[in-house]
Amino acid sequence: MVTLPEITEVLSAHPGVRRAETAIVRHNGRDVAIAAAELSEYVSGPILRNHVRQELGEDSGLAGVLIVEHMPMADGAVDVEYLASAVTEGRCTLFEDPRDDVERQVAAIWSAHLDVRSVGVNDDFLELGGDSLSALGIIAAIEAEFDRPLDVYEFMSAASVRRLAEILR
């Protein structure tokens, strides 16, 4: 089992991270590990989460990374209530595995074209490092896999695996 200090250490070693802290927060009736990261250069939360999963394994336990300007602290430790509110308010996207074959196929295509090991169904295409070139490659792969046309506007407005899978169903 990976510990919170191990997650913090891996995040802190990332070249784009100035400081990182981790905590367990309660969300939808379960405990989830969330990290807060102050950045020295721009990198998205999903990319940092993927970095941790690459270093510590898929079962690292890290559900999400909140990008902060200044580390939220309370009584000398990371402010767990602040992190929990960020998750509740949707400012921190939590990793969620694909739930059916369509989502799994779309996530696998994104993973291959974006060179991201784990793509969650709520991850944003642009936050994963997507650009116009990768969009065209993904669109071509999806058209081939699902045997249906998909235009750029349709793809970009979907923005996540889950929403794109809904369009493809």
Label each residue range with its predicted role.
Residues 1-2, 166-169:
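Actinobacteria-biased recognition of intrinsically disordered, low-complexity terminal regions
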Residues 1-2, 69-123:
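Acidic/polar alpha-helix N-cap and adjacent early helical turns
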Residues 16-24, 28-30, 107-128, 134-135, ...:
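Phosphopantetheine carrier-protein modules
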Residues 129-130, 142, 164:
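Short, compositionally simple motifs enriched in small residues
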Residues 1-10, 57-64, 92-96, 124-127, ...:
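Adenylate-forming
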Residues 1-2, 43, 101, 133, ...:
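A generic structural signal for alpha-helix starts
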Residues 18-19, 28-32, 56-78, 134, ...:
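AMP-binding/adenylate-forming catalytic domain of the ANL superfamily
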Residues 1-58, 109, 140:
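AMP-binding/adenylate-forming catalytic core of the ANL superfamily
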